[in-house]
Amino acid sequence: MIKNYLGRRWLNNPAIQAYVKQNAAVAHSTVFQGNLYEYTVMRELSEKLRMTKLRKTGGAHDGGVDIKGSWPVDDIYWKISSLMPNLEMASNIKRTNSQNGFVLKPLKYRIIDHTFEPLKVLVQCKAFTKSKLSPREFRELVGTFTSLVSHSQRNKTVCIMCSPHMLTKDTLNLINNITLPLIYLRVEMLKEKTDGHFDLINSGKLINYYENSYASTLMQDCKISEWLKLKLYKNSDFNSEK
């Protein structure tokens, strides 16, 4: 129901409001804007993608990761199945697929076999107001992922990059050749209203969701894109933690 979605949204907004109030004196600094963007991203990850256990980790020893959390993708899979039983769930997906030289078992089979465990998520936020992300930022993200995630955990961890801008063609080509599950989220920055307050309702939204080729193969038929496109998060209710 819509009220469940709105209720979840208001649960996330107090953290943003508290941060703004505590740091009003430096509200136009780069550091403030970066932290505010991270709180905004956390809100969208929780509300739109149902990620849980989200926490900010930014700091001198964060290893390049701004947010860590957990993603029970199976919740979305089963919720779509119950809300839209006529939505075709492909049954002819191979048990294993090859992507850029790696053999992958789609998460769907872990879900239906009841062996799935929530994915770990590593999130990096780039609150660039003018410039678009370049391939360099993604190469650095790959370095962060490989330094923090062992080979055996590669398909149990998803790397997420967030920024307010669309990707360039060159950057798209690059990330589709990256041999790890990478998701790009275009999330707006919060807009300041004429009264000086930030618009927590109509800005700071998740605009685009994009899986690279590796993530798309791994998450084949999990229906995340459909979940977002149909705005099914407005009609579902989850526990806040899992």
UniProtKB/Swiss-Prot annotation:
Q: What are its GO cellular component terms?
A: mitochondrion
Which cell locations does it reside in? Answer: Mitochondrion
Instruction: Report whether Ribosomal protein shows up as a keyword of the record.
Output: no
> Secretion signal: which residues?
none
Phenotype on deletion? Impaired respiratory growth and sensitivity to 4-(N-(S-glutathionylacetyl)amino) phenylarsenoxide (GSAO).
Q: What InterPro entries does the record tag this protein with?
A: RRG7
Q: Has UniProt tagged this entry with the keyword Mitochondrion?
A: yes
Superkingdom in the source lineage = Eukaryota
Q: Short name of one Pfam family for this protein?
A: RRG7
Q: Which family does it belong to?
A: Belongs to the RRG7 family.
Any further remarks?
Present with 1420 molecules/cell in log phase SD medium.
Family annotation (PANTHER family) = REQUIRED FOR RESPIRATORY GROWTH PROTEIN 7, MITOCHONDRIAL
What is the protein name for this chain?
Required for respiratory growth protein 7, mitochondrial
- Which organism encodes this protein? Saccharomyces cerevisiae (strain ATCC 204508 / S288c) (Baker's yeast)
